[in-house]
Amino acid sequence: LPDGKPISVYSRKHGFPEAERVTGPDLMLELFARDNGLRHYFYGGSPETLQMLEQKLRERYPHLQIAGMVSPPFRSLSAEEDAAEIEKINASGADIIWVGLGAPKQENWMYDHMDKVRGVMIGVGAGFDYHAGNIKRAPMWMQKLSLEWLYRLMQDPKRLFKRYLVTNTRYLWLTRTKRQ
């Protein structure tokens, strides 16, 4: 599920015509709205964000099954701590593990744990903060034009400048120079 426009365009050009952009926050709401019996686990965000997120989700989606919520520390976990976190996630019986650590940390975490975690892991970046009410999403017209990144950059330039302008430029350069 490509969350960014460049990835969806690249995917469609390389044999995946159905690869339309689906943002993590939008996917969350779509799946929460369905009363399908899925158990949801939330990994990431601050304790306050998770508390507010849980409150808002329980109000809006009373049928939603929350299997667990964990705010990991902002440091690397020891091997023992990591094993305990994975055991907690797996013991919860979660079907979907929403990972809100931000890019690229959440992608690295999911890659490192793909053979350990039972359930589908989905990286949602700032999705927890959006749905908890901590930060506002871009206006709908910007979302539809795939300019949400620009809105976020204007809101938090110090933190996002490197990610959006340096890293994304490098990605575009690599995709254009890759030989098929």
Predicted feature descriptions by range:
Residues 1-3:
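A short beta-strand/loop micro-motif in the catalytic core of glycosyltransferases
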Residues 71-77, 119-155:
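Short, flexible loop segments at boundaries between secondary-structure elements
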Residues 7-9, 105, 127-132:
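Short gly/pro/ser/thr-enriched loop/turn and capping motifs at secondary-structure boundaries
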Residues 89-103:
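Proline-aspartate-enriched helix->loop->beta-strand connector
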Residues 9-13, 137-180:
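A transmembrane-helix-recognition feature enriched in membrane-embedded lipid enzymes
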Residues 54, 107-116:
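Short Gly/Thr/Asp-enriched flexible loops that form oxyanion-binding sites at enzyme active sites
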